[in-house]
């Protein structure tokens, strides 16, 4: 497991973030009680366009113009491209199924993985990427969630989602 965690650790503004794709996780309310002890965020992976989507949300959460006073909640808010915490939770909050786990340390990652089960993906980048197929279910879900029009490729989809996240910074 530690090898998978190391391979899915990314440096963003001189700080390390573990970004894991987990298939078939079981998410219940108990897991969210761990937010009081551990720093992490889980996002519904069905609506993540690419790992760059998560990295961009993390970068935006590092700004001084935050919507939430909790950095980890801010990541969810930014990833959802909304200014409302409740809306962000409704749109991208983790549910049982495929999730993206974001945290800073291996201990937290291992504790969360033990609680939610599922299959940790060896390559989170590949797992989170939306297929380049406009008829793909994940592609359609993301287009609908962000209200995008005339999107014909995954590259264009990712660009437009990142733009939606950036626009939030202008509104804060």
Regions found by a protein language model. Give the residues of each.
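Low-complexity, intrinsically disordered regions enriched in charged/polar residues
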Residues: 48, 52, 79-82, 133-136, ...
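Phenylalanine-focused residue identity feature
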Residues: 10, 38-40, 71, 127, ...
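Glycine-rich, aromatic-bearing surface loops/beta-hairpins
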Residues: 94-172
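Ordered, amphipathic secondary-structure segments that act as subunit-interaction surfaces
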Residues: 51-109
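Secreted/extracellular ectodomain signature
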Residues: 1-13
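N-terminal interaction modules that seed assembly of large macromolecular complexes
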Residues: 15-70
